[in-house]
Amino acid sequence: MKKIFKKLINLGKWKIVFYFSVLLFFTCLIFSIFYLVNFYNKLEVNNQKINQVENKKCENCTRRLIDGVYVSEGQENNIVYAVVIDNQPDARPVFGLGEANLVYEAEAEGRITRYLAFFSNDLDLKKVGPVRSVRPYFVDWAKEFNAILVHCGGSPEALAKIKKEKVLSINEFFNGEYYWRASNMSAPHNIYTSTEKLTSYFNKNNLVANQIMSWQYKDEDKEIATTSSPIIKIDFKDMDFVVQWKYDIINNEYLRYLSEKIDKDGNDKEIRAKNIIIQFMETEVIDEELRLKIKTHGQGKALICLDGECREGVWKKISGTSRTRYYVNGEEVIFNAGLTWVEVVRENFKINY
């Protein structure tokens, strides 16, 4: 009887050991999975950083002046095209934004926004547009880069400004051979161009690239913020023009949403930017068409977002031909290389971030 009792006791001990072993095994398994997931995420971030700066290791590489990306020596100061691109719902999806070096988004009239997208002529883009009419402030921004302005007509003030200030432009009204009209789109949302056509204009007229005044750029080699500003929302007071930028920590960039959907260009490429600037500017309505006058020189408030955080600062443009620069706590902002997207808003705009 005592032997049976001892066997039962020993059997209970083994059950306890067994259950404890099982518990320990699953606990270790859970921690291992957690560790591997965390390690994988960090590895992805590091790989992304390596990919973004790997060109730096090649011989004779230098930063492209328009966006800070490393390119072969001799390609840093190519001619730049500043293309006025439609953003009406009937024009979407637009072509070219996913490959742009720099984009300004600003109201054209009546809370309807339009893009001024900058492209270095070393890019091979088969289709860019729809191309629309220009506004005076677009002319000012194009001049900052000595860019060739690409547009289809414009407001009276803008066309007069182009003529008076002798801004180099390719107006579709007088240069139709460098554009085409798509049969599947209705006017005025059907005018497109390509970098091949624009470069043929450049070559035909024996143009020379002028020096670009560059911003400062850095390599992405620091710790990335994870909690400060994952979403930036700009509400242009129209459901069709509500913009959100959501921070992607894996790639250290901002994914664009338009009307609450991921914004993709006509080639199904997501619109992603390395730097987001919200630039508050003095604005007034000047005519019955609700066109605007935007003061592009002087200084004002700005919100500068990169590496997962937004910082309040100021923008300054000391003259009509100088480059707009951005400052936080008195120091000029050093941007990540890649696409910078400038959201131009009225002074009283409220930005959620």
Name each model feature, range by range:
Residues 1-23:
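N-terminal Lys/Arg-rich, disordered targeting/topogenic segments
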Residues 18-35:
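Hydrophobic membrane-insertion alpha-helices, especially the h-region
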Residues 27, 47-102, 109-353:
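A surface/extracellular/periplasmic glyco- and lipid-processing/surface-interacting theme
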Residues 30-48:
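Sec-dependent signal peptide cleavage junction
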